[in-house]
Amino acid sequence: MYLEKIVETKREEVAKLKEKKISLKDSFQKGKLTLIAEIKKASPSKGIISTNFDPQRQLELYIKGGADAISILTDEKYFQGSTNILKELRPKTNLPILRKDFIIDPIQIYQSLFLGANVILLIASILTKKEISNFLKISKDIGLEAIVEVHNHQELTKVLDTETEILGINNRDLSDFSLSLRNTEKLLEELEKLGKRRDFYVISESGIKEKSDIDYLRSLEVDGVLIGEALMKENDPVLKIGELFPEKRSNLQ
């Protein structure tokens, strides 16, 4: 009898653990462009991006500027990130946190939950279609959302018949780090031709620096943008966010 009560209590506790409390998808609203502001110190293509790297200060400024979500690089060797940064910043915000890393094994997904991430990145170029499907299922089962990132036609084809809900279009080719903002439009056109444009929330990633870039992406009706370098290089990212997103300037008043 007591054992049955204990098990029932544990079922209730587990159900609460699985509840999604913070969701990136909730930030996607018609007519609104979601800003995912990234915290990163360096990259293989640019070297050191932020010489006075202070993750907590960066988070505070992103919140002040009106960011809708935060991306945190946790790769140590190539981006000089750390899982500790995510773990330490998690209690300091209620915004969704994306763990930005190269996920190749399920253990990293469980680790992401433990660290406090709400969203993980799955990079189609380094995963098979079967792995993408499996990782999406694991993520959903434990209450994590996932952005599946693609750069070209082959990668887009790979994710079409999976349970992908949030599609990240990387304007940078990770094989040679070349960059073209036009890549977002190109892949959106492919989705349109396939009749699948409305099947996904779409986030444009990389190379977004000026208001003209934001205006261009708004014209494509993407749901969100991920901006890292352009904000990390600024002494005052709040002003930069206001420049890119005039509607967010009211946050400062």
Swiss-Prot record:
Reaction catalysis annotation: 1-(2-carboxyphenylamino)-1-deoxy-D-ribulose 5-phosphate + H(+) = (1S,2R)-1-C-(indol-3-yl)glycerol 3-phosphate + CO2 + H2O
Pathway assignment: Amino-acid biosynthesis; L-tryptophan biosynthesis; L-tryptophan from chorismate: step 4/5
EC numbers, comma separated: 4.1.1.48
GO biological process, one term: L-tryptophan biosynthetic process
Record keywords: Amino-acid biosynthesis, Aromatic amino acid biosynthesis, Decarboxylase, Lyase, Tryptophan biosynthesis
GO molecular function, one term: indole-3-glycerol-phosphate synthase activity
InterPro entries, A to Z: Aldolase_TIM (IPR013785), Indole-3-glycerol_P_synth (IPR045186), Indole-3-glycerol_P_synth_dom (IPR013798), Indole-3-GlycerolPSynthase_CS (IPR001468), RibuloseP-bd_barrel (IPR011060)
UniProt-listed HAMAP family: IGPS_B (MF_00134_B)
Similarity comment text for this entry: Belongs to the TrpC family.
Protein name (database record): Indole-3-glycerol phosphate synthase
Gene source species: Petrotoga mobilis (strain DSM 10674 / SJ95)
Gene that encodes the chain: trpC
